[in-house]
Structures are given as C-alpha cells and as structure tokens.
Amino acid sequence: MFAEVLTIGDELLTGHTVDSNSAFIASKLTEQGYWVRRITTVGDDVEEIKAVVGEILARKPEVLVISGGLGPTHDDVTMLAVAEALGRKLVLCEKCLERIKAFYEKLYSEGYIDDPSLNEGRKKMAYLPEGAEPLENTGGAAPGAFIEHKGVKIFVLPGMPREMKAMLEKEVLPRLGRRKFLQRKFLAEITDESKLAPILREALERFNVRIHSSPKGFGKYIGLIIFAEDEGELEKTVEYLESRGIRLEEA
C-alpha cells in the first residue's frame, strides 16, 4: 500500500520551478488507496538519480512514480539513469520512434517548427530501459515507461505538468486499480496542537490508521484527516479520540 514519488530537474532544486508535479501525483495515489511514504527531488545527474532510485527500491514500496528528464536535451538523462539503476540496457522502442516522428511531422505541418527530421535528440527519447512497456504521451513527444522490478511497479513520466497529468490519468492509474481506502475529515475542537499530539500518538499505536493534523492558526479547531483500510478501525479511532475528550465535527 506504500508508494514513493521522485521528481527530477535542476530547476526544482534552484527554485526556478515550483514542484507541483509531486503534489498532484501524491494526491492521485492517495485517492487510489496508496500511502505516499516519501517524496524526493533530485537534479539532472545520472549518478544522483541512480543513487536515489537505489535507495527507494531498498525500501520496497509497491509503487514508484518518477517525473521529469525525458526530453531531447543533454540534461534529460532520466531513462538512462533508471536503466542503469536497474542493471538494464537502454533499447530502442520502434513504436515510440514512429510516434515521435509523427509528432514532429505534425508540428512541422502546423508551422510550429521548421525541421521535422529525427535528429539525435529526438531519437534519444525513443530509448527505454530493457523490458519496459512504453506509456503513450498524448500531449508531447517523449513516451513514458512502465517497469516491474523485484515487486516494485515503476512508472517514468514526463516533467511537463500537462503531459504528466494526462499520462498519470490514462496510463498509470488504470494499471494500479483502486484499492479499498477510507478517509474522513474532521475539525477537532481543541486549540493547542501540543495537547492533541500525545492523544493522536496513542491512537496510532492502538489502531491501524494514519492521521494527518493541520492547525488552523490559533483558532478554535485543528483539522484532522483519518486514513484507514478498514471502516471498523476508522470508527474505533473516532470513538477513542472522543473518549479522550476531543470533540470532532465532520469537515
């Protein structure tokens, strides 16, 4: 039920681009019933990406979603890094090459580019890790990739938000399916988060749930979201919190 997200790009580390991709991916995985355990960001460096992918795989999540670094430029090295991290070769996907060719010919016919030929940068995008299943990019040139490796489902997606979102919705989520996952939102009538913290910790020790708390400034309420796979566990958690004097209102 655990998942991790890895976003890639020097622009994310310098602050020139806000990483909205990881938030979108995490929200969609949560809706599908996965708990996102970590979100990691790394720059466009093969060795750095390899190291981080290795660390993630050692934690054995069920799902790893990677976003960014699939384009035609010199610093788009994600597919190479992922392949090396998995001990695989990069191999040409002929189907991907044909689609990339058609994509640039369409741009040329519409007057967006002046040369539709497949230069080395464009060809590079057709290479995927050996054994990977290509994921269709309906909004751009670079295909994504789906790889199952030692029990981990790995998805490699583009970094352009529009392309990433479409690929996640159309190619990734259907392969994951929806798991039984419940969440309920409450407002806890308590003003001091430090007094609520030990009660939440006790609830987490007693029940198979996850609890997210978000203070609303120094107002009257603290927001709570309780996540569970079993409705009984969720209900017992609510009853326990109320037995400890925490008044809960559905949010």
UniProtKB/Swiss-Prot annotation:
InterPro entries: CinA, CinA_Arc, MoaB/Mog-like_dom_sf, MoaB/Mog_dom
SMART domains in the record: MoCF_biosynth (SM00852)
SS bond partners: none
Top-level taxon of the source organism: Archaea
UniProt xrefs under NCBIfam families: molyb_syn (TIGR00177), PRK03670.1 (NF002977)
UniProt cross-references to PANTHER family, sorted A to Z: NICOTINAMIDE-NUCLEOTIDE AMIDOHYDROLASE PNCC (PTHR13939), NMN AMIDOHYDROLASE-LIKE PROTEIN YFAY (PTHR13939:SF0)
Similarity comment: family membership: Belongs to the CinA family.
UniProt protein name: Protein TK1472
